Amino acid sequence: MTFSPPDLSRVPGVLGRIVTEREADYRNADASLGEARAPHRRFEQALRLSPDDRGARLALIAEVKQASPSEGAIAALDPAQAARAYAEGGAAAISCLTEPRHFGGSPEALRAVVAASEVPVLRKDFVVHPAMLREAAEWGAGAALLMVSVLGERLPEFLAMTEHLGLDALVEVHDERELDIALAAGPRILGINNRDLTTLKIDLGVSPHLMARARAAGFSGVLVAESGYRAPADLREVYGLADAVLVGTSLAGSGDLAGAARALLAR
């Protein structure tokens, strides 16, 4: 398979540095996807709420996260133990970082989470190469993150790769331009990141604004609110709009993963 990477020169700031590193990591990797795999849709199904449930509750994607550029070291988590604790606390799915330099992730962490977890697992990384999606499927993940800020107009191509591999795709956006690109590509799961990954600043108003815009545009898929949620009050504005919330730092650094997961979703 002939593959040319996305144009990463247009990606600024912290995000630009990270994706440039990941492109270098995979520059000489095999771009073939292998045999087509049947879709399971377990990740999507675990998150999707009925219209009646959407205003009453949220599904939780709990993240196994050792560190981040904004926080530094967060917690020395045992990935398998963390996965079990999150599931005990009611998580519908688990996100696991595999980016090593800035987030302390690894392939081994993802494999351990998959082996320990009875809920579907998202590979959380900065996907810039087909090999990263092939790996996600081979390692047992049910879904992979696709960032419009990184892939831009190449998003449909990468969505087709996830379909070939039987993976669900969490398509992530942060602003209206990215949302328009995502909606044109027809995703089934759309994540709204409150964090501007070029500056690392958080604005909790981003998710409700873009979610309302997505629903008004006719999007009927799964909506996920991402980043900056530390307490139930933080989630007030996304009830009724979101199906799910993805939470990493506040859970991973809590010292009581199951208890923190339960407390976050308490109403």
UniProtKB/Swiss-Prot annotation:
Keyword Hydrolase on entry: no
One function term, GO molecular function aspect: indole-3-glycerol-phosphate synthase activity
CDD domains given in the database record: IGPS (cd00331)
NCBIfam families: PRK00278.2-3
Family to which this protein belongs: Belongs to the TrpC family.
Catalytic activity: 1-(2-carboxyphenylamino)-1-deoxy-D-ribulose 5-phosphate + H(+) = (1S,2R)-1-C-(indol-3-yl)glycerol 3-phosphate + CO2 + H2O
Keywords, in A-Z order: Amino-acid biosynthesis, Aromatic amino acid biosynthesis, Decarboxylase, Lyase, Tryptophan biosynthesis
Gene name of the record: trpC
UniProt-recorded name of the protein: Indole-3-glycerol phosphate synthase
Pfam families: IGPS
E.C. no: 4.1.1.48
Pathway given in the UniProt record: Amino-acid biosynthesis; L-tryptophan biosynthesis; L-tryptophan from chorismate: step 4/5
Gene3D superfamilies, A to Z: Aldolase class I
